[in-house]
Design a protein with these regions (language model features):
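C-terminal all-alpha effector/ligand-binding and dimerization domain
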Residues: 1-130
Length: 130
């Protein structure tokens, strides 16, 4: 994980694991990792009451640039349990993303498993003039 966050292996990492609900139905399981040295006392925060990005903003280390990867895959057993997915053949949306500040500091790595019937994604794509 230190390699993904571009920190030394001996630096502390804070892990935030959450199940997100939409209309009282579990919609996604999210695993977020941030360099603890950038965020003093992060382990004392109640992120059920506080937005992670609001907290990061306090320390002027908010993600402004995201490198994202989307994969459609079968749901792993552990996440299927959290998402109440019964069929082992159900597919989910798996996102991996790395968040960087405007200074290029990596401040977040997240893996998220989205229940496919609970979410919808829309994308806009723009091309620069050639």
């Amino acid at each position: 994980m230190a390699k993904r966050l571009r920190i030394s292996p001996d630096e502390p990492i804070f892990a935030l694991h959450r199940i997100r609900y939409m209309d009282d139905i579990p919609a996604l399981v999210e695993y977020t990792y941030i360099p603890a040295t950038y965020f003093p006392h992060v382990e004392e925060q109640d992120f059920s009451m506080l937005s992670l990005y609001d907290y990061m903003k306090k320390y002027n280390r908010i993600s402004t640039d995201f490198h994202q990867k989307l994969t459609i895959m079968k749901c792993p057993k552990k996440e299927a349990k959290y998402l109440n997915i019964v069929s082992k053949d159900d597919s989910i949306f798996y996102f991996e993303y790395l968040g960087r500040t405007n200074k290029g500091e990596v401040v977040e790595y997240t893996r998220a498993y989205y229940k496919s019937e609970a979410v919808q994604f829309r994308f806009n794509q723009y091309y620069a003039d050639f």
